[in-house]
Design a protein with these regions (language model features):
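Beta-strand-connecting loop/turn residues
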Residues: 48, 99, 184-185, 342
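Amphipathic, non-transmembrane alpha-helical segments in extracytoplasmic/periplasmic proteins
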Residues: 51-53, 105, 119-143, 158-182, ...
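Assembly/oligomerization scaffold segments
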Residues: 1-112
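An acidic/polar, Gly/Ser/Thr-rich interaction patch typically located in mid-to-C-terminal regions
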Residues: 33, 37-65, 211-366
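Short, compositionally biased
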Residues: 86-95, 120, 157, 193-195, ...
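Short acidic, glycine/proline-rich loop/turn micro-motifs
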Residues: 114-118
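Short beta-strand-centered interaction patches in the first periplasmic/extracellular domains
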Residues: 2-3, 7, 100, 106-109, ...
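Conserved "cap/hinge" positions at secondary-structure junctions
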Residues: 74-76, 190, 320
C-alpha cells in the first residue's frame, strides 16, 4: 500500500495545486476557473504534457501566448506539494458554448533549434561529450548523464541531415538508454532500472490492489527471446566473430516459473547488422534485448487517490493480483495525474524492471 501518503485523520481530502506563470503565482480567481488539469510524466523523448481547461463562460479570460512558461506544483491540501516542473505553452484553443479555453504545454520546446537538420561527424568522442555538444548547440543547461553512459567511447558516428532530437534518440537506442529534455536540460539515462538520470537509486514503492479502482495487464508476444546475438568484423585480422548474450537468473534468485517474459532458453534473436568491434556489438545486443524485455508486458492501474510524487522510472512492486503480475518487478513508464470534478487520480503504466537481469556471454569466431 502507498502508506507514505500522509493525510490528516478525519480531514477533508482536497486536491491542491499552484500554477506559476512568468514567475507569478496564478491569481486565486483565475485558478478557480480551472475545470480540469492533467499532467503526464513520460519516459523517453516524448515531452511531459500539461493540459488545462478554463471556464470562460463570461468571456473575461485572456488567452495565453504560445511560448509562455508555466510552473506546476501538485498534491493535496495541507501537504507539501510536488514540483511537476516547467512547461512551455504550445497550443491554445477556444471552444463553446459554454466558452472554454484549452491550454496544452510541454516540458520541452522542440519548436526551435531541435527541429533543425544537422550534418556532423564525431570521431573519437565519448557518448557524454556528444550529448554535451548537442546540449550546448541548443543553448540548454548541462546535460545529466550517468558515468556508465558518459564514458562510453565512440570511435566514429555520423549525424547526416538529422535533427538533434532524432540523433539523440538514435544514440539512446544504440546504447540501451532513453533521452528526454526536462527543465531546460537533456537527461540521458538507462531505462527500466529504477534510477534517476544521474544514476541514483529511486526508492521502491508498493501498490496493493485496494489502492486502485481499475487495472489492466497485457502480455505481448515477443517470442520470449532469452538472448540476442550480434556479429562484428575486425578489419585488422579480417575475421568475423559473434557475441551471444543469454539471460540468466540474477545471483541468488530463482527464475520465476510463472513469468511470461523470461524466455524459453532456446529463442535467440540474431541482429542483421555487422558491427565494427566487439564492444559495439555487445552494447547493441544488450540494448536490443533490454528493449525486448521492457516491451514484453504492460501493467496499468488507476490510483483512487492521486500521487503526484510517482513519476516515470520509479520502481514499483504490486500485490493482490495474479501471481504472474505480483512476481514481476516493475518500473513506471508513464504517470498521468488528473484533477477534475471527480477528484484527483493517478494512472500508472508500468513496464518490466530490467536492472536485475543478468547475462551469460559467449564469443565465437566465425
Amino acid at each position: 500500500m502507498l502508506t507514505d501518503l500522509q493525510l490528516p485523520v478525519g480531514a477533508r481530502i482536497t486536491p491542491a495545486f499552484t500554477l506559476t506563470i512568468k514567475n507569478k503565482v496564478l491569481e486565486e480567481n483565475i485558478s478557480a476557473r480551472i475545470i480540469s488539469l492533467s499532467v503526464t510524466d513520460n519516459s523517453g523523448f516524448t515531452a511531459d504534457t500539461l493540459n488545462l481547461t478554463f471556464d470562460d463562460s463570461d468571456g473575461q479570460l485572456q488567452m495565453p501566448v504560445r511560448g509562455t512558461v508555466l510552473h506546476l506544483h501538485l498534491g493535496w491540501s495541507k501537504q507539501a506539494l510536488y514540483d511537476c516542473g516547467y512547461f512551455t505553452v504550445d497550443t491554445v484553443t477556444h471552444s463553446g458554448s459554454p466558452d472554454k479555453i484549452g491550454v496544452v504545454a510541454r516540458s520541452a520546446d522542440f519548436r526551435g533549434s531541435f527541429d533543425n537538420k544537422i550534418s556532423q561527424s564525431y570521431d573519437d568522442y565519448t557518448l557524454g561529450a556528444i550529448v554535451r555538444i548537442i546540449s550546448s548547440r541548443n543553448k540548454l543547461d548541462l546535460p545529466v548523464i550517468p558515468q556508465e553512459l558518459d564514458s562510453v567511447k565512440i570511435p566514429h558516428i555520423d549525424q547526416t541531415s538529422e535533427t538533434d532530437s532524432y540523433f539523440l534518440t538514435r544514440l539512446a537506442q544504440r546504447y540501451g538508454a532513453q533521452v528526454t529534455v526536462k527543465n531546460g536540460a537533456i537527461l540521458f539515462f538507462k531505462a527500466g532500472t529504477g534510477r534517476t538520470s544521474s544514476g541514483q537509486a529511486i526508492p521502491w514503492k508498493t501498490i496493493v490492489r485496494s489502492d486502485g479502482d481499475n487495472h489492466n495487464y497485457q502480455m505481448v508476444d515477443k517470442k520470449a527471446y532469452d538472448g540476442v546475438k550480434a556479429q562484428w568484423h575486425d578489419l585488422k585480422t579480417a575475421t568475423t566473430s559473434s557475441v551471444a548474450l543469454k539471460r540468466s537468473p540474477a545471483e541468488g534468485k530463482e527464475a520465476q516459473p510463472a513469468s511470461y517474459i523470461a524466455g524459453s532458453g532456446t529463442n535467440v534473436l540474431e541482429l542483421g547488422k555487422i558491427f565494427p568491434d566487439e564492444e559495439t556489438a555487445k552494447r547493441a545486443a544488450d540494448s536490443v534485448f533490454n528493449q525486448i524485455q521492457n516491451d514484453a508486458a504492460t501493467f496499468s492501474i488507476r490510483l483512487a487517490l492521486g500521487r503526484a510524487d510517482l513519476s516515470a522510472q520509479s520502481p514499483v512492486n504490486v500485490q493482490g493480483f495474479k501471481d504472474v503480475i505480483d512476481s514481476q518487478r516493475w518500473v513506471i513508464d508513464s504517470a498521468l495525474h488528473e484533477i477534475n470534478e471527480k477528484g484527483f487520480t493517478t494512472k500508472l503504466i508500468l513496464k518490466p524492471y530490467v536492472a536485475d537481469i543478468t547475462y551469460q556471454s559467449s564469443i565465437l569466431q566465425l
